[in-house]
Design a protein with these regions (language model features):
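Beta-sandwich interaction modules
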Residues: 3-33
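Regulatory cytosolic signal-relay segments
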Residues: 29-88
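Short hinge/gating elements
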Residues: 50-57, 141, 191-195
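Catalytic NTP-binding/metal-coordinating core of nucleotidyl cyclase/transferase enzymes
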Residues: 76-162
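Catalytic beta-strand-to-alpha-helix segment of the class III nucleotidyl cyclase homology domain
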Residues: 144-263
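Helical mechanochemical/support elements of P-loop NTPase systems and associated helical scaffolds
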Residues: 66, 119, 138, 198-205
Length: 264
């Protein structure tokens, strides 16, 4: 495919320079095509070409931060300390271990801590299997990031299944449960305490959706759930509306459980 654009078709700016107006429709050229710009004047004229959209295969800061190996080895070097990076969209997952406080009281710190630490390994494996990265642990909870919501939902299902199996072979496993919630949107990434961390309304909403879940459940925005073709082992069991702090309107949400745990 060839596209020929005469320089006379471009728009003059002040001072006699020539450039296309930003209001002009974008030029679409087939992959592998060639663009020719013909200058019929005696004077040289600069020509500038720009992509109006990000290249889908570009290695953006957000994309490389989602690689588990990168996050482990050099993630802290991605940003200067205190320098925020605005990302247009990231999917964030929060977990919580139900019953852990009572477990510490009933079996003691050592046994309870071992269960909590071991369950982190279970969650990490499930997250990384779907391209996610554990951003941080907070007490007995995990925050993880994903490039898109489909991966988050599938990881949530894998985590719930793996956690159920883990509890079946772990002392005191019957005393705890796992609940999850996820949400996607824009936020800020900063380097804090030698790791990358996320801040903003998306983080707050994701954490609050997790708070609406019960043991063995994952809570997702209904519109996001409907846009995902493959939910992994998760199956919808309920749709409900809830008022989430910081969000002006009530949200339509989906409550999901693993297929074998979902009611008929």
């Amino acid at each position: 495919t060839e596209l020929r654009v005469p320089l006379s078709a471009l728009d003059p700016l002040e001072g006699g320079e020539t450039a296309t107006k930003t209001t002009r429709p974008p030029l679409r050229v087939a992959p592998g095509g060639t663009i020719y710009v013909q200058n019929t004047e005696a004077a040289a004229r600069p020509v500038k070409l720009e992509h109006l959209q990000f290249a889908s295969r570009a290695a953006t800061a957000l994309a490389v931060s989602q690689l588990p190996e990168f996050a482990r080895l050099v993630g802290r070097d991605l940003l200067r300390p205190g320098t925020p990076l605005s990302v247009s969209r990231v999917a964030l997952l929060f977990s919580d271990l139900v019953g852990s406080t009572a477990l510490y009281a009933s079996v003691g710190d050592a046994a309870a801590f071992r269960l909590v630490a071991d369950h982190f390994d279970v969650l990490k494996a499930a997250m990384e299997a779907e391209g996610g990265v554990v951003v941080k642990t907070m007490g007995d909870a995990v925050m993880a990031s994903f490039p898109e919501e489909g991966a988050l939902v599938r990881a949530a299902g894998k985590a719930l299944e793996a956690f159920e199996e883990f509890c079946g072979r772990t002392p005191h496993g019957a005393a705890v449960g796992l609940k999850l919630g996820g949400y996607a949107g824009p936020c800020y990434v900063i380097r804090a305490n030698e790791t990358l961390d996320y801040f903003g309304q998306t983080v707050n909403v994701a954490a609050r959706l997790q708070g609406l879940a019960g043991a063995g459940e994952h809570i997702a925005l209904a519109s996001a759930w409907d846009a995902i073709a493959d939910h992994g082992p998760l199956r919808e069991v309920e749709r409900f509306t809830a008022q989430v702090k910081g969000v002006p309107e009530a949200l339509l949400l989906v409550r999901a459980r693993c297929e074998r745990a979902a009611p008929p």
